[in-house]
UniProtKB/Swiss-Prot annotation:
Organism of provenance: Prochlorococcus marinus (strain SARG / CCMP1375 / SS120)
Annotated family: Belongs to the bacterial ribosomal protein bS18 family.
Protein name per its UniProtKB record: Small ribosomal subunit protein bS18
Subunit structure: Part of the 30S ribosomal subunit. Forms a tight heterodimer with protein bS6.
One Pfam family named in its UniProt record: Ribosomal_S18
Keyword Ribonucleoprotein: yes
InterPro entries for this protein: Ribosomal_bS18 (IPR001648), Ribosomal_bS18_CS (IPR018275), Ribosomal_bS18_sf (IPR036870)
Amino acid sequence: MPNSLFKKKLSPIKPGDPIDYKDVETLKKFITERGKILPRRLTGLTAKQQRDLTTAVKRARIIALLPFVNPEG
């Protein structure tokens, strides 16, 4: 079996850094073109970071910083 299947990804966000719902550019890295939140296995985030990311994206959607769905996609 190739070792690349089991290679651990490093988290793109440092463990101590907070995920801010007002930082739209950072949040856009973790959503698809259609506006869906990427799963943890693709983002490389820890479980806590993924929960915080989900909360931040949902807050940004509620206050209209991010769209719920992308009309172009």
